[in-house]
Amino acid sequence: MLNIKWIRENKELFDEKLSQRFIEPMSSKIAMLDREKRKITSLIQEFQHARKVKSKILGNMASKSGEEFEGLQRDVKHINEKLEALEHDLNNNNELNELLNMFPNIPDEEVPYGMDESMNKLVRTYGETNPNALNKQHFELGIKLNLMDFEQTAKISGTRFVTLKGDLAKLERALINFMIDVHTKEWDFFEISPPVLVRDNAMYNAGQLPKFAEESFATTNGYRLIPTAEVSLVNMVADTIIPREKLPIRYVAYTPCFRSEAGSSGRDTRGMIRLHQFGKVELVSITTPEESTNEHEYITNASETILQKLNLPYRVMLLCTGDMGFAAKKTYDIEVWLPGQKQYREIASCSNCGDFQARRMKARYKEFGSNETTLVHTLNASGLPIGRTMVAILENYQNEDGSITIPDVLINYMGGLQKIIAYSE
């Protein structure tokens, strides 16, 4: 959520930043709603003060009867009626909060202006792409290996689900352990095993609700399946005041993730690129405003390390204003090279959310010996999605005979297996 005080003091800049997100100017409407809310709040405070004064006089009166006493009683009753009406108006006039909840984060100064991914800025590349490489797509390879099943899975769960078998299931497990080991041992992230069912307020805190309600799966009794472990991890500091010396806090978690893929009809309908259920290792950092820019580079580099160790070509893109996520003020996308598609595809997003999530969930820190609190900054990065990493391995490590060479760093995690070959039932 954006800071209403900042909007109040920076109306023109606010409208300018909204225009970069392709949203019409809204400062005038917000100012009007804000004035109305502040006027009601001011009246409530005045009436509360008047009630306190009159109640004190009533309490000190020697005689609890007579015209003066009864007149004061009538005044207090009238004040209570006024207060009840004003508090009702304040509690039921949610238009300002509803409007603020629909605004995305303000783009950082470094974020390029642009409408879509074609305007994203290349930051760096890693590894060489080979235009003459074998180019079967991952689902062709997986099906031929008899280790990736879509047809029978569709009978169980419908489309956008997959069943992995044998050595591909083992590769999935190996990748999870490998990624967690790298992030905990080399990058100082603390491993968490969080819940995947959360309440709506946790989704709201993370910026998923109310705007993206249709993109998640909801239960009938008030829970939602997480679309990313970011939701669970950032909420670990909700409604807390953290001592400054404990920052940064860095969490890593592997969880299954669930997305309805609303609005993705016709996109990536084959294979494992876009599924309703997928596994992902997620990174979250909690830090101070002064350190969040450096922490953004740190968490992005941690994510990149996985691809470097797997020797997978990739590039890092700075997203433009029109392509950034809702809660982010600045985002790097990491895109891995897929020979089967002959293009780079997103495998990770690494975002600095500033105090956007922290304001929603009241996550603060304070210096030693101080009573003043400041909102923390939250950051997140994929570190990485297991399915898309498997896609990249299958396509980049495929052999002429359809087998898949295991990347060197995964051989021990695979129990010494160096190659995945077709499974014969």
From Swiss-Prot:
<dbReference type="InterPro" id="IPR045864">
    <property type="entry name" value="aa-tRNA-synth_II/BPL/LPL"/>
</dbReference>
<comment type="function">
    <text>Catalyzes the attachment of serine to tRNA(Ser). Is also able to aminoacylate tRNA(Sec) with serine, to form the misacylated tRNA L-seryl-tRNA(Sec), which will be further converted into selenocysteinyl-tRNA(Sec).</text>
</comment>
<dbReference type="GO" id="GO:0005737">
    <property type="term" value="C:cytoplasm"/>
</dbReference>
<feature type="binding site">
    <location>
        <begin position="259"/>
        <end position="261"/>
    </location>
    <ligand>
        <name>ATP</name>
    </ligand>
</feature>
<keyword id="KW-0067">ATP-binding</keyword>
<dbReference type="InterPro" id="IPR042103">
    <property type="entry name" value="SerRS_1_N_sf"/>
</dbReference>
<dbReference type="Pfam" id="PF00587">
    <property type="entry name" value="tRNA-synt_2b"/>
</dbReference>
<dbReference type="InterPro" id="IPR006195">
    <property type="entry name" value="aa-tRNA-synth_II"/>
</dbReference>
<dbReference type="InterPro" id="IPR002317">
    <property type="entry name" value="Ser-tRNA-ligase_type_1"/>
</dbReference>
<feature type="binding site">
    <location>
        <position position="282"/>
    </location>
    <ligand>
        <name>L-serine</name>
    </ligand>
</feature>
<dbReference type="GO" id="GO:0005524">
    <property type="term" value="F:ATP binding"/>
</dbReference>
<feature type="binding site">
    <location>
        <position position="382"/>
    </location>
    <ligand>
        <name>L-serine</name>
    </ligand>
</feature>
<dbReference type="GO" id="GO:0004828">
    <property type="term" value="F:serine-tRNA ligase activity"/>
</dbReference>
<keyword id="KW-0547">Nucleotide-binding</keyword>
<protein>
    <recommendedName>
        <fullName>Serine--tRNA ligase</fullName>
        <ecNumber>6.1.1.11</ecNumber>
    </recommendedName>
</protein>
<comment type="pathway">
    <text>Aminoacyl-tRNA biosynthesis; selenocysteinyl-tRNA(Sec) biosynthesis; L-seryl-tRNA(Sec) from L-serine and tRNA(Sec): step 1/1.</text>
</comment>
<comment type="similarity">
    <text>Belongs to the class-II aminoacyl-tRNA synthetase family. Type-1 seryl-tRNA synthetase subfamily.</text>
</comment>
<keyword id="KW-0648">Protein biosynthesis</keyword>
<dbReference type="InterPro" id="IPR015866">
    <property type="entry name" value="Ser-tRNA-synth_1_N"/>
</dbReference>
<dbReference type="InterPro" id="IPR033729">
    <property type="entry name" value="SerRS_core"/>
</dbReference>
<comment type="subunit">
    <text>Homodimer. The tRNA molecule binds across the dimer.</text>
</comment>
<dbReference type="GO" id="GO:0006434">
    <property type="term" value="P:seryl-tRNA aminoacylation"/>
</dbReference>
<dbReference type="Pfam" id="PF02403">
    <property type="entry name" value="Seryl_tRNA_N"/>
</dbReference>
<keyword id="KW-0436">Ligase</keyword>
<dbReference type="InterPro" id="IPR010978">
    <property type="entry name" value="tRNA-bd_arm"/>
</dbReference>
<dbReference type="InterPro" id="IPR002314">
    <property type="entry name" value="aa-tRNA-synt_IIb"/>
</dbReference>
<keyword id="KW-0030">Aminoacyl-tRNA synthetase</keyword>
<feature type="binding site">
    <location>
        <begin position="228"/>
        <end position="230"/>
    </location>
    <ligand>
        <name>L-serine</name>
    </ligand>
</feature>
<dbReference type="GO" id="GO:0016260">
    <property type="term" value="P:selenocysteine biosynthetic process"/>
</dbReference>
<feature type="binding site">
    <location>
        <begin position="346"/>
        <end position="349"/>
    </location>
    <ligand>
        <name>ATP</name>
    </ligand>
</feature>
<keyword id="KW-0963">Cytoplasm</keyword>
